[in-house]
């Protein structure tokens, strides 16, 4: 039982190549390479058995494949004979190979006929097919896709039997239970379905990344004393993309425990898994895991309850080339797939190149924790050329054959035999012949002989060049595109870039930002366009922070020093302007101007005369003050005397007035008196 590297759901991750051994006998090894070709190899003699190229192999590449189960024995009474059509259908199904494509269709290829058997399209998937599983009893198959649905197909009628939604996100892996009544499906979480009712029986936690492989590890539960319903107590294994842990789960009667009971740890992401089923509680499970780094890890463990610590491999297998000479060093050879043989004591290893793999049977030795096999595969990769490659091929004709050519009936043109290839063709021309020059020929053909100026590169070629440069790490090609200064050209190029090249482009821009300042200015324009145009795509990436962490730290460091640089820039401008102004005014003559105020310093003799004059002036000033005070006193005395005289006159007037009132005399006029009366 094996699970091949079907495909990664991450667009940025390198996709695994779908491959699988034929069931039971493992006589064939099917491999769908990246060029869209299906190749079937014989494992016994490492020979190519068949090769099939689908019509849409470039647009609809193969994403997963699965062999049909071995020949089924129908449970019928001996009196009833099997129909001829049923027998033919059963034998044909034995050698069918199901291929899932990136466009949602499923192809059934017959290895017996060497041609396409049928195609499953109508009512199926609308997106990439991630996994295919054949049912071992009913002659149907199940498929899951990125469109979130699971489809049950009838292989005989090529129609959909049932279709239901498997998850809120894409469904990446499937596995059918040993009794054929349950189905495991996984996106990030794992669900156990009842096939009869299409209802969820159990939920499991799953992995943080999309699950790439699912398989049951046991047929019977460890506790055989309790009644067995076909699923309770069984263990199954799951592996995920970018996850170095393989988790083991147990289906229990209660629905409380949803976490894994144990896990196996490997060195890298698993791309191919094969195991031997445990038929009783005392038989250990043997597990072979092929990692992306090209190593094979072998595990052997009895599944019996919970284990807290992750289990490490019992044996690790590597393959390397022999070092030729003292200076040459051995190079590792990647292992592509590994499967247990029927005796469970040996292993089939597929290593080398996907286009020309090498298949070898290796005996297992549990005593050695590490095995390194030295293999020379240089001869296997060399293409065999039987005939010389020539551009010109002459047809082989019989000397007695007659060749008919157009002409008048009855007249036969003489056919000269072709000259042998050993003769040399004369390359010298006859001198003195009247030969027309090339310029005259072009003039006669009315062709413009003037050379056209060098045209500018078209905009649509920039995305192609940039994509090729990022994939091949071509420095000259990247410089040709990234050193452009036209902002409109940069925007159009970024708009036409494929989505899977955005992260490599940002990483290349980050690398160039750390270089020369002149190139960093150009990279800032590219970076601005990428972040503005593809902001929605970047926000959907789950691992955006670790991928763009270097760019973020670089921007933060540049922003921190911006204020200091601006202050320094202002000071430098001030100093430079002052220096330039002083240099300009140094040589120029200033125009004549009159001083608004002139201060002259006096000598020491003048200062002494001034001091004497100041003293005299101070003495005179004191005398003047005394005289002014005496004059003020005299004036005050005179004013007092005048005031006393006036007071005396007023007193006399008052006395006379009072006497007149007493005597009845008044100073009123007669008219006034009459008025009073």
Swiss-Prot record:
There is a cross-link at residues 309, 384 (Glycyl lysine isopeptide (Lys-Gly) (interchain with G-Cter in SUMO1)). Pfam families: Utp12, WD40. Residues 414-445, 582-677 are annotated as: Disordered. This is WD repeat-containing protein 43. N-terminal domain is required for nucleoplasm location and C-terminal domain for nucleolus location. The modification Phosphothreonine is found at residues 321, 394, 656. The modification Phosphoserine is found at residues 77, 399, 431, 437, 590, 658. The gene is WDR43.
């Amino acid at each position: 039982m094996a699970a091949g590297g079907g495909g990664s759901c991450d667009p940025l991750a390198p996709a695994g190549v779908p491959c699988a051994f034929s069931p039971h006998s493992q006589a064939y090894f099917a491999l769908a390479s990246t060029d869209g070709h299906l190749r079937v190899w014989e494992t016994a003699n490492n020979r190519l058995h068949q090769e099939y190229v689908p019509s849409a192999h470039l647009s609809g590449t193969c994403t997963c494949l699965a062999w049909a189960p071995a020949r089924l024995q129908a449970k019928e009474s001996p009196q009833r004979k099997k129909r001829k059509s049923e027998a033919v259908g059963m034998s044909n199904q034995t050698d069918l190979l199901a291929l899932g494509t990136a466009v949602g269709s499923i192809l059934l290829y017959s290895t017996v006929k060497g041609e396409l058997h049928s195609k499953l399209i109508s009512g199926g998937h609308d997106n990439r097919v991630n996994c295919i599983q054949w049912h071992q009893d009913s002659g149907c198959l199940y498929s899951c896709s990125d469109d979130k649905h699971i489809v049950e197909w009838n292989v005989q009628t090529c129609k959909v039997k049932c279709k239901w939604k498997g998850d809120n996100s894409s469904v990446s892996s499937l596995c059918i239970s040993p009794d054929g009544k349950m189905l495991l499906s996984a996106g990030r979480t794992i669900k156990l379905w009842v096939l009869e009712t299409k209802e969820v029986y159990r939920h499991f936690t799953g992995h943080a990344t999309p699950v790439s492989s699912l398989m049951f590890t046991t047929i019977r539960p460890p506790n055989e004393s309790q009644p067995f319903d076909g699923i309770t107590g069984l263990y199954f294994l799951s592996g995920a993309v970018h996850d170095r842990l393989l988790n083991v789960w147990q289906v229990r009667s209660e629905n409380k425990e949803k976490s894994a009971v144990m896990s196996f740890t490997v060195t890298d992401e698993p791309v191919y898994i094969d195991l031997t089923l445990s038929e009783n509680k005392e038989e250990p499970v043997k597990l072979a895991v092929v990692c992306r780094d090209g190593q094979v890890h072998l595990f052997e463990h009895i599944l019996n309850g919970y284990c807290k610590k992750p289990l490490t491999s019992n044996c690790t297998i590597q393959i390397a080339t022999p070092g030729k000479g003292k200076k040459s060093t051995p190079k590792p050879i990647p292992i592509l797939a590994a499967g247990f043989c029927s005796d469970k004591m040996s292993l089939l290893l597929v290593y080398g190149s996907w286009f020309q793999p090498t298949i070898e049977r290796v005996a297992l030795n549990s005593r050695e924790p590490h095995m390194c096999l030295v293999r020379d595969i240089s001869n296997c990769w060399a293409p065999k050329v039987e005939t010389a490659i020539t551009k010109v091929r002459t047809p082989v004709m019989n000397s007695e054959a007659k060749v008919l050519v157009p002409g008048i009936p009855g007249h036969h043109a003489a056919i000269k035999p072709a000259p042998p290839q050993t003769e040399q063709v004369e390359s010298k021309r006859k001198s003195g012949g009247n030969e027309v020059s090339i310029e005259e020929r072009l003039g006669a053909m009315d062709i413009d002989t003037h050379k056209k100026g060098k045209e500018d590169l078209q905009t649509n070629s920039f995305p192609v060049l940039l994509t090729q440069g990022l994939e091949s790490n071509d420095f000259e090609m990247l410089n040709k595109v990234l050193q452009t200064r036209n902002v409109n050209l940069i925007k159009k190029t970024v708009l036409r870039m494929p989505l899977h090249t955005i992260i490599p482009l940002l990483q290349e821009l980050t690398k160039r930002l750390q270089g020369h300042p002149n190139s960093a200015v150009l990279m800032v324009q590219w970076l601005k366009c990428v972040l503005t145009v593809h902001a929605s795509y970047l926000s959907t990436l789950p691992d955006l922070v670790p991928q763009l962490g270097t760019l973020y730290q670089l921007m933060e460091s540049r922003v921190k020093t911006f204020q200091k640089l601006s202050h320094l820039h202002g000071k430098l401008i001030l100093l430079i302007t002052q220096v330039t102004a002083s240099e300009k005014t140094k040589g120029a003559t200033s125009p004549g101007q009159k001083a608004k105020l002139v201060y002259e310093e006096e000598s020491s003799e003048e200062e002494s005369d001034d001091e004497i004059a100041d003293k005299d002036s101070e003495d005179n000033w004191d005398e003047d003050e005394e005289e002014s005070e005496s004059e003020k006193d005299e004036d005050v005395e005179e004013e007092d005397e005048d005031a006393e005289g006036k007071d005396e006159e007023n007193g006399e007037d008052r006395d006379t007035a009072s006497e007149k009132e007493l005597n009845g005399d008044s100073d009123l006029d007669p008219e006034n008196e009459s008025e009073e009366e």
